[in-house]
Regions:
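Alpha-helical transmembrane segments within multi-pass membrane transporters and channels
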Residues: 1-2, 143-151, 187
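Functional transmembrane core segments of multi-pass inner-membrane proteins
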Residues: 28-36, 40-140, 183-187
Length: 187
């Protein structure tokens, strides 16, 4: 089916980009495995509205391992305490949204898979990445959902998989996070 072609094409493009962008083999291997896990999560959540724990835990394990590999400090936070704080802040930021939504609406909203995914992003980039990643993900989700809502193709009660937006926001942070923060600090 077309979905398999798209996944394989994106995996190939991602691997090529990683291979051409980094010269440290530790970085290349780590980033390729992370990219593959994120790609699986993205498509599983799009299709089934779930994020398998095994994939989220894989990200967290890789995020912890990266603290002990050489020459990764330019890409990710390499301070184990910042990494741990990032995981906790990432998880709690989504957990708080889930909790408040349930208290206000009296029903389930997001799942804890999104919280675990955000924990993995926090473990990778540190706590300081969480506000920007969450903002970008929310903005992307809103921009994608608005046309369907305005055309009344979807209602406010429609399910929206959030992992693709968290993953995209994490990628934006990975590529442009420092630039975005410099722009924000100037403003």
């Amino acid at each position: 089916p077309l979905q398999y072609f798209i996944i394989e094409f994106l995996a190939g493009l991602g691997f090529l980009f990683i291979f051409l962008s980094f010269d440290n083999y530790y970085s290349i291997i780590l980033l390729m495995v992370l990219f593959l896990i994120y790609l699986m999560i993205l498509f599983i959540d799009l299709k089934h509205f779930i994020i398998p724990d095994i994939l989220n835990y894989g990200i967290i394990v890789l995020a912890i391992i990266k603290n002990f590999l050489p020459n990764l400090d330019l890409i990710f936070t390499q301070d184990i305490m910042l990494s741990l704080a990032g995981g906790i802040v990432g998880y709690l930021s989504i957990w708080l949204i889930i909790y408040l939504y349930k208290q206000i609406r009296k029903k389930e909203g997001m799942g804890l898979g999104d919280a675990k995914l955000m924990a993995g992003i926090g473990f990778l980039f540190g706590w300081q990445s969480i506000p920007l990643v969450l903002f970008i993900a929310s903005l992307l989700a809103l921009l994608v959902a608005m046309p369907s809502l305005m055309a009344k193709k979807k209602g406010l009660k429609s399910k929206i998989p959030f992992a693709p937006y968290l993953i995209t926001a994490g990628l934006v942070y990975f590529l442009y996070g420092n630039v975005i923060y410099k722009i924000v600090l100037v403003i």
